[in-house]
């Protein structure tokens, strides 16, 4: 009996340690992300414009995004994985830099960026709290999120051809919902012991928060009359 209690306690401590390390690494990951965004915004660097074609730029972004995720996951238990995560977040900061530069140079732009950031933080805190209490089937939610990810990617590619503003807003709203659920799923998976790598968990949470912030920023800019 004592042995069973010890095993349960040790397992609980282990899961809590992974979650704590995940949150800590997630916080650190925003340092290079902020540096990348500030660098790109101050330098006026536009990644897509640098290639002279949005298609080439889009392909390079996809290669960077999924390539880095692959290498981070391959090193998910080592310090190399942490280093690669920092490189990844810096790169993602560079990508969002031009949007921030644009937003900060329009009327009420700083306020809009602040609102998007505050709403993102609120979503994260809310979904993290819900993850501790939810009774949802995480396997079913995981399957739903997989289907949702495919639908969103198809919609993104389709709108590159169509260029419909209303569809772009719908996609942004979809990313907010999808990423919010992803936060809850990832945190709950760590709590349940289904994820033992704080690097992988932090990566998922960073991408989710990045998507929420950028999507909310797009929505708020559109509501403010800015395309």
UniProtKB/Swiss-Prot annotation:
InterPro entries the record matches: Bax_inhibitor_1-related
Origin organism lineage: Bacteria, Pseudomonadati, Pseudomonadota, Betaproteobacteria, Neisseriales
Main location: membrane
One BP annotation, GO: regulation of proteolysis
Membrane protein topology class: Multi-pass membrane protein
UniProt keywords, alphabetically: Cell membrane, Membrane, Transmembrane, Transmembrane helix
Protein name: Uncharacterized protein NMB2020
GO molecular function, one term: calcium channel activity
PANTHER family named among the record's database cross-references: BAX INHIBITOR-RELATED, MODULATOR OF FTSH PROTEASE YCCA
Annotated source species: Neisseria meningitidis serogroup B (strain ATCC BAA-335 / MC58)
Organism superkingdom: Bacteria
Ranges that cross the membrane: 25-45, 49-69, 80-100, 111-131, 144-164, 165-185, 201-221
CC annotations in GO: plasma membrane
Keyword Cell membrane in annotation: yes
Coiled coil regions in record: none
Compartments in which it is found: Cell membrane
């Amino acid at each position: 009996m004592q042995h069973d209690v010890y095993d349960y306690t040790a397992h609980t401590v282990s899961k809590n340690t992974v979650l704590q390390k995940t949150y800590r690494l997630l916080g650190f990951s925003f340092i290079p992300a902020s540096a990348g965004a500030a660098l790109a915004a101050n330098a006026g660097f536009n990644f897509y414009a640098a290639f002279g074609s949005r298609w080439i730029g889009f392909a390079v972004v996809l290669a960077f995004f999924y390539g880095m995720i692959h290498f981070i996951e391959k090193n998910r238990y080592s310090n190399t994985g942490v280093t690669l995560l920092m490189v990844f977040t810096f790169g993602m900061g560079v990508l969002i830099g031009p949007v921030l530069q644009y937003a900060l140079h329009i009327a009420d732009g700083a306020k809009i960026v602040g609102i998007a950031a505050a709403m993102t933080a609120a979503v994260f805190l809310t979904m993290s709290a819900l993850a501790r209490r939810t009774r949802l089937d995480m396997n079913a939610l995981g399957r739903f999120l997989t289907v949702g990810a495919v639908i969103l990617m198809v919609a993104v590619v389709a709108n590159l051809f169509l260029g419909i503003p209303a569809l772009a807003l719908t996609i942004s709203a979809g990313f907010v919902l999808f990423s919010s659920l992803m936060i809850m799923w990832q945190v709950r998976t760590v709590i349940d012991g289904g994820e033992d790598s704080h690097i992988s968990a932090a990566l998922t949470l960073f991408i989710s928060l990045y998507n929420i912030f950028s999507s909310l920023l797009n929505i708020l800019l559109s509501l403010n009359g800015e395309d």
